[in-house]
């Protein structure tokens, strides 16, 4: 048989997933943290490619994140055009300054953004423009001062109004990249406001913070990105500066995962940058890495499938 008469490779075969260890863990998995084009920075794939690759790998859900824009519209388009592939796709708003900042009006728009009956499935506080991250990046005092923070007492406006909107819509509140103490205060305040779906990025926290937020009913998120070499490359945002955040060794991340009460943890790839493999392969490598470091397969299954499916109300076809 010559090359011209061979059947074309499926996308799964092209990615080499079928024969790789850990590929079976992707069946029914949910990756709630994917960055894809269109985007201000280069990405390894576009939204449609991300959905197709997820479908070929057997994933059931995909969450699109964008630090510069509301991603709910792209998600709605992907569901309409590629819904037959069986992957539920959603987006939401990260309240970074380029996306409108911490604004109740921007939240209202995001919650209604899409086709009729659709909208954002998560609302996140800033992930880069926070004082916590600005200090980690070594930003100037003036830059730090302009960033978001949560005071020790009370909530800054318009956060109470935003909490009411999130609670009424029953979507996920993501605490963003704030300090550990801020995250605990935010979860407590969100619970008081009636928010029931809360996700806390915990890769850089200590075990006490992970235990505290999960004991309050939140889910702790752990992402592949922070355990990789990509943390060594300076990230460009809307300015010309490049900054890095500290990496997290896999054994240390495993200890944090084990601190989550009742295994209230969610695993994600946070892939899309060219320095890392595409999200599907990044997620496979992450799961295999955690398994190698001692996390049992049953626990991995809960954290990559069951927990995010419940948190994001993943729709099955």
Q: Which sequence ranges carry the predicted segments?
A:
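Acidic (Asp/Glu)-rich catalytic clusters
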Residues: 23, 75-86, 109-119, 164-167, ...
